[in-house]
Amino acid sequence: MRADGRLFDQLRNIKITPNVSEYAEGSAIVEFGRTKVLCTATYESKAPSWLLGTGAGWITAEYGMLPRSTHTRIRRDKSMTGGRTQEISRLIGRSLRAAVDLKQLGEKQIIIDCDVLNADGGTRTASVTGGFVALALALKKLHAVSEIKTLPLINYVSAISVGLHEGQILLDLNYDEDSAIGTDMNFVMTDKGQFVEVQGTAEHVPFTRDQLFKMMDVAEKGCRELFIHQASVMGEIYKIAGA
């Protein structure tokens, strides 16, 4: 039993609230326990210049933390070029591109903004999970008004953290767990069981191949539960593989 009462393979309380922005094409607030992220999707009718003439579109993302999303105030990253900020922004963009057939999207762009309102660990995984909902809702709206000819969603995408502490695998780390953990990993998966991204670091004690595979299994369990949460707020957009 963990300090917050969860089982080792149990997610925090997950809540996704869709359509929270009056102006964005798609939006959602996602909560992983005390971590809360606002995700919005903005449609641009033109692809980036380097894609013009290819027939393909683009999904990109920007991530940021509000100054009082943490215990003490953090300075705004006005340039959006800070190492961690840029790394997570790119992770979110890569992850969400795996959800879409970019050729079907056409020469258009959707920008996903993920703003952390409250941080208690797992902000990047919450951003991917909520960002997918905002993206899917935007695509649904754009298809309904014939801005895009077909709905280009091809996968659900969600993300979760897994840690290894004194030989015990833990799912969905909060801040205290993440700070004390021996091995910290982030997994991004599709509903077809494919891995989009695997990030892992042994902070103190190296992990074995067997432990890695077990962490992958626990991560897949968590991601599959997240797919159900995503589907529950999106309506009939795209059916989860195997559901």
UniProtKB/Swiss-Prot annotation:
Top-rank taxon: Bacteria
Keywords assigned: Nucleotidyltransferase, RNA-binding, rRNA processing, Transferase, tRNA processing, tRNA-binding
GO BP term, example: tRNA processing
Reactions catalysed according to its record: tRNA(n+1) + phosphate = tRNA(n) + a ribonucleoside 5'-diphosphate
Pfam families the record matches: RNase_PH, RNase_PH_C
GO molecular function: 3'-5'-RNA exonuclease activity; tRNA binding; tRNA nucleotidyltransferase activity
E.C. number(s) listed in UniProt: 2.7.7.56
EC top class, as a word: transferase
Amino acids binding phosphate: R84, G122, T123, R124
Family from the record: Belongs to the RNase PH family.
Subunit comment: Homohexameric ring arranged as a trimer of dimers.
Purpose of the protein: Phosphorolytic 3'-5' exoribonuclease that plays an important role in tRNA 3'-end maturation. Removes nucleotide residues following the 3'-CCA terminus of tRNAs; can also add nucleotides to the ends of RNA molecules by using nucleoside diphosphates as substrates, but this may not be physiologically important. Probably plays a role in initiation of 16S rRNA degradation (leading to ribosome degradation) during starvation.
HAMAP family for this protein: RNase_PH
Protein name as it appears in the record: Ribonuclease PH
Organism whose genome encodes this protein: Bdellovibrio bacteriovorus (strain ATCC 15356 / DSM 50701 / NCIMB 9529 / HD100)
